[in-house]
A protein has these predicted regions:
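PLP-dependent amino-acid enzyme catalytic core
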Residues: 1-462
Length: 462
């Protein structure tokens, strides 16, 4: 298997190079040149296996021999050994045909740990073989940054620089990024919003002289390995409910489209997913795009679900690539229109292709808070605001097919929003009880590419 860019003009790579590269040289995102199918028997055979074994069986066809079978199994085992639940991704029933998939039992209490903990292991193994040193740069709306720092802190051959929007993440999210004292970790508070941070990271990747000089690597969901790791829990949850003999649907709270795109890949592999429901907050560009066909950016509105406060959903480009028949030139044209004019119109054929698979909904601030309060009172289940967005949207799409809503973060990561809705402040797990007593290390920077690049040059390897 080889990996190709969504814009059609970058080198074709193998899995390891794709993982270490992140963003393609033509500005596109890498995808496998084909999606290997799983047979019904293979999918059924996942039932009853450990999460680690399911991960091995689902991901193995994509890694192109980059790791031996034994090494890959070992790296997966190490990646998930620090999770706080033996099932890794346990499921709870909310209503007769509605289930909640808890993805917040990892080290930083968010779904990003499923991918980031594995990527940390894969990077370490690959770099140990080559003797290379890389500079990991990422943008975060909150959870990606803390998950990346937790996965890479203390590694000898990796420097980590995480850009987050100053004043636009929760206190818990910020402290998870700013309190690790490892010398290879650098938290950068940027004046702007998440889209500002994401644009700066993409600009660094497109500055080839800088990219090569510091050996830049990316761990945002532009990195294919991130998406691949998230495919697994779609399979693990679906087989629990009877797949492949019984179809399921998923509702996914999403801003950057990476998590729901992992569900799309699972469907491409043969998992019987009836519908993938995109749940957005008031920053609803994905909902508007599917509804009208117009992908038109607007100003980011701060919300109680800040990890979804995004207008430029990077991974949507991957879905567009398939919807346009894998026409890289057409996708490149759309992305140029987005950069130059702030939006584009999706062709009717591509829009129909997307609507065959995806549907969408949005939750207002009031609806999000009301969902947190209602579920806590009715079931005792306390949701984070992002998960509440998912539940609210899922409830409008329930049918005879079981619906699985992804619970993306622990409620204690967003205590103010949860307390405002329920009157009770959620507690952090014991291992994080002293988070607010730890010293912070953070550098605040303006929205200036040159200033950020200069800091990275100075600090990497220091």
């Amino acid at each position: 298997m080889k990996y190709i860019s969504t814009r059609g003009a970058a080198p074709v790579l193998d899995f390891e190079a794709t993982m270490l590269t992140g963003l393609a040289r033509d500005g596109g995102l890498y995808l496998p040149d084909h999606v290997p199918p799983m047979t019904q028997a293979e999918i059924a055979g996942l039932a009853g296996q450990s999460y680690e074994e399911q991960a091995y069986l689902v991901m193995r066809p994509f890694i192109c021999g980059a790791f031996s079978d034994d090494e890959f199994r070992s790296l997966i085992s190490k990646a998930y050994s620090g999770f706080g639940h033996p099932a890794r991704a346990p499921m709870k029933q909310l209503a007769p045909n509605h289930f909640l998939l808890e993805l917040f039992h990892g080290p930083t209490l968010a779904f990003k740990d499923f991918a980031m903990q594995l990527i940390g292991q894969l990077f370490q193994a690959a770099l140990a073989r080559s003797g290379a040193r890389v500079t990991v740069v990422g943008a975060t709306s909150g959870d990606t940054g803390s998950a990346a720092i937790e996965a890479f802190r203390g590694l000898e051959n990796v420097d980590v620089f995480i850009l987050f929007p100053h004043g636009r993440v929760s206190d818990v999210q910020r402290r998870q990024m700013t309190t690790p004292d490892n010398s290879n970790v650098h938290a950068l508070a940027i004046d702007g919003d998440f889209d500002t941070c994401q644009a700066l990271v993409k600009d660094m990747f497109n500055d080839f002289a800088f990219r090569d000089a510091v050996q830049l690597a990316g761990v945002n969901s532009i990195n294919w390995a991130r998406v691949l790791a998230q495919v697994v829990y779609y399979f693990s949850s679906a087989v629990t409910l009877g797949a492949p003999h019984r179809p399921v649907s998923f509702t996914v709270p999403t801003g950057n489209f990476g998590d729901v795109f992992a569900g799309y890949i699972a469907r491409q592999m043969g998992l019987p997913i009836e519908k993938l429901v995109i749940a957005t907050n008031q920053n609803d560009i994905l909902h508007r795009a599917l509804s009208s066909g117009g992908y038109l950016t607007d100003g980011v509105k701060p919300s109680i679900s800040p990890s979804m406060d995004i207008q430029v959903s990077s991974n949507f480009e991957r879905a567009l690539f398939d919807a346009y028949g894998r026409d890289g030139a057409a996708v490149a044209q759309l992305m140029d229109e987005l950069k130059q004019g702030g939006g584009f119109q999706i062709s009717q054929g591509a829009l129909e292709s997307l609507r065959d698979i995806f549907t969408s909904g949005r939750a207002s601030e009031e609806e999000t808070s009301a969902t947190i309060a209602r579920l806590a009172a009715a079931t005792g289940e306390v949701l984070c605001p992002h998960s509440a967005v998912g539940v609210h949207v899922a409830e409008a799409h329930l049918s005879a097919t079981p619906m699985i809503t992804l619970a993306t973060a622990h409620p204690a990561k967003f205590p103010d929003a949860v307390e405002a809705a329920t009157g009770a402040r959620p507690r952090l797990p014991a291992r994080m009880a002293d988070l607010f007593e730890r010293d912070e290390r953070v550098t605040r920077l303006p929205n200036e590419l040159s200033a950020i690049q200069e800091l990275i040059r100075e600090r990497r390897g220091a």
